[in-house]
Curated annotation (Swiss-Prot):
Its EC number is 3.1.3.11. One of its GO terms (molecular function) is magnesium ion binding. InterPro entries: FBPase_C_dom, FBPase_class-1, FBPase_N, FBPtase, Fructose_bisphosphatase_AS. Mg(2+) 2 binds at D100, D103, E263. This is Fructose-1,6-bisphosphatase class 1 1. The gene is fbp1. PROSITE patterns: FBPASE.
Length: 333
């Protein structure tokens, strides 16, 4: 049985085969993750990728598997976070696919959720022109999360769908055709250990959340941080809230750490199609054009009102983001 045989009408016909191939590999990756430590050490370091990040064995296994599965498909160009350059899979192909084969691999040995993130554009004449374009040109984007359940969240530009893997039939079952980001939540996700490196608007926003009922927001907030983008995204789609990975003052973090092609564009696509918001703190993510395959960007996404509020902090005069929260124009009546 093909992975999406039970709901063929939910996937555009020209993407059905590619989605089946992605789904088949995801099922095998999920099985290997479940057996990790029995047959092989999936968490062992086996090298570094093009940006110098350590590669776990499962990073390489997943990348090889997805690339091999897409040979002979409609995918003309394949760009992976684990590879320096894009490769041509099919000269006659009509699609360009970017992928983070195993997001959150630093969590493998702790048994936290990891995932696969993918983005699909129409193929252009070259790999460069296919991928170095705005996220608004996407025709599909999504992620697979390998957790207590294996789920696929995907958008084809007409809302966001949720599929759950049925282990018995080894197929993905469509459980929600119109996922929506809850508009209200008291949760935010950020790595607070980097507070001293953040810009003033980001500090001001977090300060106001931490101030709780005694601050201008008048309510208590909870902080979350999993260091797994797919897990953070999945929680926000279920419960609302906001995720922040801003730029900061450290060397190499001037544009954040998340990659536009492989992480930010597809996640922003899923979130905005579900009624949420996604920016770099000031401008919409999907309106940006990356300068190179592995370009990074600050990334803030979640419930639309919360993302808009963070953007408003960036619009305040500097003296107000430096002032005590009670004096900020954002909260004046």
């Amino acid at each position: 049985m093909k992975p999406f045989a039970t709901h063929p009408d939910a996937i555009p016909a020209d993407l059905q085969d590619v989605m089946d191939r992605l789904g088949s590999v995801a099922i095998e990756v999920a099985t290997r993750i479940a057996r990790g430590g029995i047959d092989e050490d999936l968490a062992g370091l086996c090298g570094t990728n093009t940006d110098g990040d350590g590669q776990k064995a499962l990073d390489v296994i997943a990348d090889d598997a997805f690339r091999a599965a897409l040979e002979g498909s409609a995918v003309r160009f394949y760009a992976s976070e684990e590879q320096e350059e894009a490769v041509t899979l099919n000269e006659a192909g009509t699609l360009a696919l970017a992928i983070d084969p195993l997001d959150g691999s630093s969590n493998i040995d702790t048994n936290l959720s990891v995932g696969t993130i993918f983005a699909i554009w129409p193929a252009a004449a070259t790999a460069e022109t296919s991928f170095l374009r705005p996220g608004s040109d996407l025709i599909a984007g999504g992620y697979i999360i390998y957790g207590p359940q294996v789920c696929l969240m995907v958008s084809f530009g007409q809302g966001t769908q949720k599929y759950v893997l049925d282990p018995g039939s080894r197929s993905f079952v469509l459980v929600d055709r119109a996922v929506k980001v809850p508009p209200a939540s008291t949760e935010f996700a950020i790595n607070a250990s980097n507070y001293r490196h953040w810009s003033k608007p980001i500090r001001a926003y977090i300060d106001d959340c931490v101030a709780g009922t005694e601050g201008p927001r008048g309510r208590n907030f909870n902080m979350r941080w999993l260091a797994s983008l797919v897990a953070e995204t999945h929680r926000i789609l279920a419960r609302g809230g906001v995720f922040l990975y801003p730029r900061d003052g450290r060397k190499g973090y001037e544009q954040g750490r998340l990659r536009y092609l492989y992480e930010c564009a597809p996640i922003a696509f899923v979130i905005t199609q579900a009624g949420g918001g996604a920016t770099d703190g000031e401008n919409p993510i999907l309106g940006q054009t990356p300068a190179r395959l592995h370009a990074r960007t600050p990334f803030i996404f979640g419930s639309a009102e919360k993302v808009a509020r963070i953007t408003a902090y960036h619009d305040l005069p500097e003296q107000e983001t430096s002032a005590l929260f009670g004096n900020r124009g954002l909260f004046r009546s």
